[in-house]
Amino acid sequence: MRVLCCLDGTNIEHISRALSTLVIDAERTIGLLYVTDSGPHHEIERKREWLLRPRHPSGPLQEKIQHAEAGASQDILQEGLRYLPQAETLSREGRPEQEIIQCASEWHADLILICPRSPASGGPTSGPKSVGHVARFVLDHAPCPVLLLRQFAH
């Protein structure tokens, strides 16, 4: 079974616990996916163009931003490998909801594991607003079954 695990930088422990109860090691291939969201860059530019003159990050500023994002992505994937050393790491850049669907299809995933929303984003833990837009899109468009991993109530 090919299981694609969607990382957000805070959920690897939760995902590794769920994986240990779902499928035995010998019967699974794990992919750890982290998507660097390009959406905020475009949103900032649209706001800037509306309020001020257009200014696109260029030169050293753009390089710093890209370097920081690449470093964060690698850190998150390395943390994932600490919990699941046999996993394959997959890194993408773009809109997370679309990249997850595309990666699941290209990687031939049998199952996608995703949390309803990042704990850092706040929001309700149950009810219709408890599932964020990324998880909602994945649930609606995935090419395979999706397991939504909610946090345990303490």
Segments the model singles out, each with a brief description of its role:
Residues 31-33, 88-92, 147:
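General small-molecule cofactor/ligand-binding pocket signal
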Residues 111-140:
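Glycine-rich, Arg-bearing micro-motifs that act as flexible, cationic patches
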